[in-house]
Amino acid sequence: MSFQPTPEDKFTFGLWTVGWQGRDPFGDATRPGLDPVETVQRLAELGAYGVTFHDDDLNPFGSSDTERESHIKRFRQALDATGMTVPMATTNLFTHPVFKDRFTANDRDVRAYAVRKTIRNIDLAAELGAKTYVAWGGREGAESGGAKDVRDALDRMKEAFDLLGEYVTAQGYDLRFAIEPKPNEPRGDILLPTVGHALAFIERLERPELYGVNPEVGHEQMAGLNFPHGIAQALWAGKLFHIDLNGQSGIKYDQDCGSRRRPAGGVLVVDLLESAGYEGPRHFDFKPPRTEDFDGVWASAEGCMRNYLILKQPRPPSAPTRRCRRRASAPRVWTSWPSRPLADGLEALLADRTAFEDFDVEAAAARGMVRTPRPAGDGPPAGRARLTVAPRKR
């Protein structure tokens, strides 16, 4: 069985991922920068579908209009030559010192600049064919509880997103926004730290249909949460507009590991995306190990795609993967589909004596989760996929 990725698999990478130079708070870069054109070419050779970018990844901050046009022209030529796509773009509103905050800054001029910088890159994203625009609020928050009124900050954030939604609508762009939640870093207390926070915020916007979420594996795990549950809720809400795949080793700083971390959880993530019919790109937001040279960078990118394809297979190809799938399963749960409704409305429920008066509490308490034969009506809807897991062996 081949695990060679093809564009049909829709694997994408950010310029900032394979282009990460290995710089961290305690050490300088271990690799030189990567030319975006080379990135496009190498990822295409590996079988990727597309590439994503922050504005400053493609056009260094402060570039003149002439320099910007030159960078874009070279990038577009590389896309045309390789057939690579740009499904998503985003804005760097966190690196330059002006962005101590951004959409929620106490300084009105900083807020206005952040929105205008975003609008400029939205134009480029739409020009390159992007369908999703990700917004990560890494600088939205505080280290001191008295530094900012959170209610005012949320009002400011709402104003910014409403303006962006108005702009996209006025321009007629076929573009939706995906808010990327993250806790703990770089601000001590970040606004919209989890999928749930983002979903609640979206409902207060003027055009909620334009906004969804871009959950990242490591970000939910940084908060000690269950990532498959988070993306399941996003799918349930119809708001999974994009997804960032990577690995994380527990509650700590944002590691952005490749898929080598937590393969058991990866099984559930991949199965959920595939069984739910998610049609968006499978985007890897990871950092190649700081210890690697460029050969290791491309090997790690290739490994991300290969591991996804391995986990996607209904029957694992190797004993280690089988063990991972068994450990990831909940052996006593035999179904992943919803059961039949409680009743045909409230009146029918109140009239149903088996729901309360005649309900055998002790018998139900003694019943295990695995039931044979299956209760009448508790079957999968037509065409609904289910998780198939090998039985546990001791």
Curated annotation (Swiss-Prot):
Q: Does the keyword Magnesium apply?
A: yes
GO biological process assignments: D-xylose metabolic process
Signal sequence extent: none
Q: Where are the bilayer-spanning segments? A: none
Q: What does this protein do?
A: Involved in D-xylose catabolism.
**What NCBIfam families does UniProt report for this protein, alphabetically?**
xylA_Arthro
Name this protein carries in UniProt: Xylose isomerase
Its source organism is Streptomyces rochei (Streptomyces parvullus)
Q: Identify the coding gene.
A: xylA
